[in-house]
From Swiss-Prot:
Record-annotated active site: 289, 323
Gene encoding the protein: ALD1
Residues at which NAD(+) binds: 266-271
Main localisation: mitochondrion
InterPro entries: Ald_DH/histidinol_DH, Ald_DH_C, Ald_DH_CS_CYS, Ald_DH_CS_GLU, Ald_DH_N, Aldehyde_DH_dom
The protein's assembly and partners: Homotetramer.
Organism: Saccharomyces cerevisiae
GO biological process: ethanol catabolic process
Name used for this protein in its record: Aldehyde dehydrogenase 1, mitochondrial
Amino acid sequence: MLATRNLVPIIRASIKWRIKLSALHYCMSDAETSEALLEDNSAYINNEKHNLFLEKIFSDYQPFKHDNRTQVSCSQHMRDYRPLLTLSSATRSVLFSLLASDMSIILSISPNTGILLCIGHLLASDIEDVVIVLSRGSPLVDLASTRIFKLAQNGTLRFAIKRTTFQELRFLRKSKDENVMEAATRGIITIRQLYYENKVLPLRFTGNVATHIEENLEFEEQITWRTHVDSSIFPNTRCAYPSGYGPSAKIPCLSHKPNDILAYTGSTLVGRVVSKLAPEQVMKKVTLESGGKSTMAVFIQHDVTWAVENTQFGVFDRQGQCCIAQSGYTVHRSTLSQIVENNLEKDPSYVLHVDTESDIRGPFILKIHFESIPRRINSAKAENSKVLCGGPRENSVYLYPTLSATLTDECRIMKEEVFAPIITILCVKTVDEAIQRGNNSKFGLAAYVTKENVHGIILSTALKTVKLFIICVHLASYQIPFGGNKNSGMGAELGKRALENYTEGNH
């Protein structure tokens, strides 16, 4: 989920407020859904009717944790509530039903709460758009064949699912827990059915990546390339995607005069060459995306199992050849043994084979790159790092999933982007130490935090990375700028930054 400063639910509305249709029903995941239509200033909270304008404290029940947390749900000041409503975690599940006309609502349901929010008949009012966003596959397992999809099927709600969430559901189908596997399969079938019936929205806007959400929503309303940009302004002949080594591909692009901009993706070494040569060639625009060294931060009370599963998925998928792969753990010493144990238990499930099945790990793309990996592993051993498992397979271009417990961040394997299925473990004592060592990295592309608590919030505000993923992995959106800082790149693609990069305005 997002850091606290950027928590998703945003209401774009006119400032003219009035009491609107109150129809909010709050129910646990094991309860039957009922649709309430209330004409007064009340709503159902915990299956009881309450007046929204009387200050009252409610008990927030979490079915997965079987505990109660007390919080203020509604109070008198809601009359003057600003058009920015937050609904994120169990500590922020504020129930509201003060609605204004001419606005769109985006509700984000935290994967930690295990709680469903069912809104009855809101579309029957003047509300134009109600979208419920589920941020991870886990709650969808619970919702897949039950309440929320029934509301989508009968047209009560416009239900949105992010493309990445659908991908995570597919990943959950590999779970060893039969109940999770079956529920994920049902969820995928149901989503496809609703999609083909135009009852579910494929949501490109991603609310999990820390960024300025207001800009993303504003960009959603802007013109689209396909329908509004005239071909004479951006002709196809001026857009090319050459791939290859620096001397044969990148450098000729710089000297090609008709090109107005060069968007580079590749190594930091060649990126430096491109950035030096570009100004010499008719002052071309250049954006550089040159990889990173991203870490997964795991602290006290964090979800170690989730962190291990998603880190292995992010690193071992594509043999680690992904720029935002979370190629290392930064762990509190209290979680170190559990991290190591969980990784060693799960590693054998990643099979090496040439097949293209989704649960198979294939070979390296380039042999020359593969040949550099054993040298880096041997270098780690020479620097007193412990290689706990993995390594190259003889007479092949395969590398078994490799786990290395690193003592210092001065090790070569910690300082360089290895671009391989290798996970390092760096142990720290405090959050401040994690921030200091994380920011010492020469890269600044992405970072991952496993929990939205105090540690997660502190890390999210202090780590010097462009992308911060909280309780999610490998999310991307056309609406959110993508790029890096430090040695991870210069400039950004996608979102508003793409409009700035690929257009020239008349002032």
